[in-house]
């Protein structure tokens, strides 16, 4: 029985994909695999038998990636599974920042007892007049799964879209509208655009990237939208930019005491991926990733180990090895096999930074003694006999 612990509520449509060989109600201390959404894992003591963690979502800043890699725990995420939900959320943010719908709604609530509210509304509505987004310039920083959807949707709404992503993948480029103007210097986004939306991960290089220097380059009355990660925007600096008129509105999906209730700021309670469809998609994708890894040893959509997809094993045996990305380990792995008289039918090795992953399909079964000898090799982190 394979024990799975769910640190957060995971959609049943995903959990239903586990076969009878899985126990999806296991305690964390007994878990072979973990499903998580937002639970913070940095201070958790990870079980020795833990093989994998799947994040039902894209961001993984709540998971200790390096610690997991050191223990041979493969961490997965579900890129793109919630992309449409976040895209729609960003479009809503664009409209909320352009048309004072929230102010209008509040006026109606405050005047609900007015017998002539319809007549009064005709006089009051001029206070909530806004601007149309059609024809305006939108800068999209980050053109991954979400950013490209936002860019394409904004084109359909008649906006002039500028996209910046120095790491743009080939697949993302193919999916991007040809009408999106590719920008090679992010400063051009700051200088040219009426609206700016951010879609990058939280890295040391991106923390506080939207800062005073960026605001100083912006046009008067720029709208900034952050539905990506809370640390990307220097929020004290953006409050100053709002006071000076550089920024007309700041829409953020990350509530905190700095921005909540501030003039010119629309704070949403982290609703970007909070749709039934997104939660279902993320759960299904996360469970499939876990099963593929546990049952076949394949790594797809990992964030701390290299992707390595060898399909279903058709040989007599398959062993997988998480190891350090250092010279001579491959020769040592094959030497152990050769000394044991085990023929290697096929082998794949992939690396990512300091870590690597090897899959060996063999002509005969892998014994416990062979697995132990593989584990004893210097630099090997975890050995698992899959078949």
Regions from the language model: what does each represent?
Residues 1-79, 211, 217, 223, ...:
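An N-terminal-biased, well-structured beta-alpha scaffold segment characteristic
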Residues 39-45, 166-259, 274:
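Rossmann-like adenosine-cofactor binding region
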Residues 79-137, 301-303:
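Phosphate-binding beta-alpha-beta segment of Rossmann-like dinucleotide-binding domains, i.e.
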Residues 87-106, 154-159, 285-298, 334-338, ...:
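Oxidoreductase and adenylate-handling cofactor-binding alpha/beta cores
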Residues 143-144:
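Glycine-rich Rossmann-fold phosphate-binding loop(s) that bind the pyrophosphate
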Residues 147-148:
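N-terminal Rossmann-fold NAD(P) dinucleotide-binding loop
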Residues 212, 220-313, 357, 387:
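Rossmann-like dinucleotide-binding domain for NAD(H)/NADP(H)
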Residues 300-387:
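A conserved regulatory-domain signal marking ACT and ACT-like small-molecule sensing domains
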């Amino acid at each position: 029985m394979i024990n799975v612990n769910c640190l957060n509520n995971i959609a049943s449509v995903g959990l239903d994909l586990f076969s009878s060989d899985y126990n999806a109600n296991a305690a964390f201390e007994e878990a072979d695999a973990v499903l998580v959404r937002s639970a913070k894992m940095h201070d958790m003591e990870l079980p020795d038998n833990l093989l994998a963690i799947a994040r039902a979502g894209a961001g993984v800043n709540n998971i200790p990636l390096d610690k997991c890699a050191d223990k041979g725990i493969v961490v997965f995420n579900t890129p793109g599974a919630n992309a449409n939900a976040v895209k729609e959320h960003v479009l809503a943010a664009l409209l909320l920042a352009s048309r004072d719908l929230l102010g209008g709604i509040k006026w109606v609530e405050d005047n609900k007892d007015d017998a002539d509210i319809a007549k009064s509304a005709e006089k009051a509505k001029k206070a909530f007049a806004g601007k149309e987004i059609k024809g305006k310039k939108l800068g999209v920083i980050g053109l991954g799964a979400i950013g490209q959807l936002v860019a394409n949707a904004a084109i359909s709404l008649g906006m002039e879209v500028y996209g910046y992503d120095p790491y743009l993948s080939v697949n993302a480029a193919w999916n991007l509208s040809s009408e999106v103007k590719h920008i090679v210097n992010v400063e051009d986004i700051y200088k040219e655009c009426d609206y700016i939306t951010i879609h990058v991960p939280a890295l040391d290089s991106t923390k506080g990237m939207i800062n005073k220097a960026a605001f100083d380059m912006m046009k008067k009355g720029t709208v900034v939208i952050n539905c990506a990660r809370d640390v990307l925007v220097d929020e004290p600096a953006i409050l100053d930019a709002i006071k000076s008129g550089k920024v007309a509105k700041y829409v953020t999906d990350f509530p905190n005491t700095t921005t909540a209730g501030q003039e010119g700021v629309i704070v949403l309670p982290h609703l970007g991926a909070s749709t039934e469809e997104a939660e279902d998609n993320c759960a299904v994708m996360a469970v499939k990733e876990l099963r593929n890894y546990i049952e076949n040893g394949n790594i797809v959509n990992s964030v701390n180990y290299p992707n390595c997809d060898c399909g279903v094993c058709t040989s007599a045996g398959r062993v997988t090895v998480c190891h350090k990305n250092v010279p001579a380990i491959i020769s040592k792995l094959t030497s152990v096999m050769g000394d044991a008289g085990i023929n290697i039918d096929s082998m794949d090795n992939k690396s990512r930074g300091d870590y690597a992953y090897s899959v060996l399909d063999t002509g005969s079964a892998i014994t416990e003694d062979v697995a132990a000898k593989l584990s004893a090799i210097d630099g090997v982190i975890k050995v698992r006999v899959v078949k």
